[in-house]
Amino acid sequence: MSKITSSTLLKFKQEGKKFTALTAYDASFAGAFDSEGIDVLLVGDSLGMVLQGHDDTLPVTVEDIVYHTRCVRRGIKRSLLIADMPFMSYATPEQAMTNATALMQAGANMVKLEGGHWLLETVTKLTERGIPVCAHLGLTPQSVHVFGGFKVQGRDADNAQRIIDEAKAIEAAGAQLLVLECIPAALAKSITEALTIPVIGIGAGADTDGQILVMHDVLGISSGYIPRFSKNYLAQTGEIRSAIRAYIEEVDTGVFPAAEHTFS
C-alpha cells in the first residue's frame, strides 16, 4: 500500500472517503495499526494519562514525545505520523520552531498544536520552513484548567462562532489538517464543509472527514473515566487486529460515531 501523506488525506476529503486515526506510542502496536490500514497515527500527549498515569496531559515533555515518536516510526511503513507538541513547548514561534524540529527529526511527518488565533504566526512560520502543522480546536486538553475541566466546547453561539473563525484563520495561516474535539456535531459539520483542509473529529460527530480515538479506549484498557465518544472494539471482536479492522469498517461505512458518541 502507498504511504499516506497530507495530499492523500486531501484527496480522501475531496472524494468523500472517510479515514481513520489512532494514537500510538510504541513500535509493536503502531506496526499492527499500520498494517491493518489505519491512515494516521498520533503520538499524543495523551501518553501522560494512559502511559504515565497523570490526571491530565500537562506534565508531558518534548523529550517524552521525541522518545515515543522514534519508537512508533520504527514500527510503521504506511501511516502518516503526527507528533503532539506538549504543554508550553510552543509558547513563542521561536520555541515552537526548535521543538517542532526535534519532533520532525525523530520521525514525525507533521506536528500538532492546540489553540486558535494566538497560534497563527507560529503556524505560518512553521509551514514556511517546511514543518507541516495539524491544528487542534474545541476541547484542547492542555487548556483543561482554563475550561474548568474536560467539557464540551462551542455550545453557545458566541463560542461556536469563535471556533469557526479560528478554524478558517488557521487554515489560511497554512495548517494542513485540523482536529476538532468535543464540539456539537452540527458545528463540526459546518466547519468541515467550510474548510478545504481535512478535518479529523473526536467527539465531534460523524460528518468530519476522519475520526481519531485513543488506542486504549478502542482496546478497552483505559482506567478510570471512559469518554462518551469512545468505543471498545476489542469487546465485540476479542482480538486486537480484528478490533482495528472493525473500527476502520465502522468509520468507513458511517456506523461510527453513532448518536450516543456525539454531542448536541
UniProtKB/Swiss-Prot annotation:
Pfam families: Pantoate_transf. Mg(2+) binds at residues 45, 84, 114. The active site is at residue 181. The keyword Cytoplasm applies. 3-methyl-2-oxobutanoate binds at residues 45-46, 84, 112. It is an enzyme of class 2 (transferase). One of its GO terms (biological process) is pantothenate biosynthetic process. NCBIfam families: panB, PRK00311.1. This is 3-methyl-2-oxobutanoate hydroxymethyltransferase. It comes from Shewanella loihica (strain ATCC BAA-1088 / PV-4).
